[in-house]
Amino acid sequence: CPNGVFDLEDKLLIGNNAIRSDEALHSFLLTMKDLHFKRHWWPGNYASNLSPHFYTLACDFVKSLTIIESDSYWYYQQNLSTLKSFFNLLLRVASKAHISPKNAILLNYHPMLLAIPTHEEFYKNAKLFIYACLNEMGLDDHSLLIDQLMLPHNLWRMGNYFNDDTYAIVVDRDPRDVFILNKYYWHPANQAVPFPLDVTSFCSYYRAMRESVKPYANNHIID
């Protein structure tokens, strides 16, 4: 999922800075909030499908990484929609007329958050978050079998997040199967198809996708 744990890892551990960490933490929280509360978004409704405590666990994870929380703001937080920009204009007019507090301003989000974790700090707290979610699903009582928990593109990260009793099984689909299903089944059924339907373009796309997979070496990955 975009803006999930792995994107947060990349943003906080590669080229991190104050504004980057603020955006990263809030983008992560917004995505976790959508996954938790949006009942009619098919990958969402975690409140019912995973745990009513999921969003609280995500907030606790962010708090464990945050070293500064401030009422200040970056220009990134001022990139408002047209409607919010209009309200900001009204606030400035009201401020000059002493009707609203001085310097009142609308922001995309608040407060400003700063996190500059070490690799060890990030992985430790991310692992606690992941296992807290898995325990909400019953891991304390029985083993779990989860479909597509990790895609092959992220399997090289596995050792940083999971214990030695965790195994990943890679299902290597035949590209011909993917192309035929998309072109002759899903597309005629008016379903969104995220792959080219021209065979030459599809082959180029699929080859590039396969070649982009970072090599992994882990005895707990079965492929």
Language model: regions and residue ranges:
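PAPS-dependent sulfotransferase catalytic core
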Residues: 1-122
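PAPS-dependent sulfotransferase catalytic domain
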Residues: 67-223
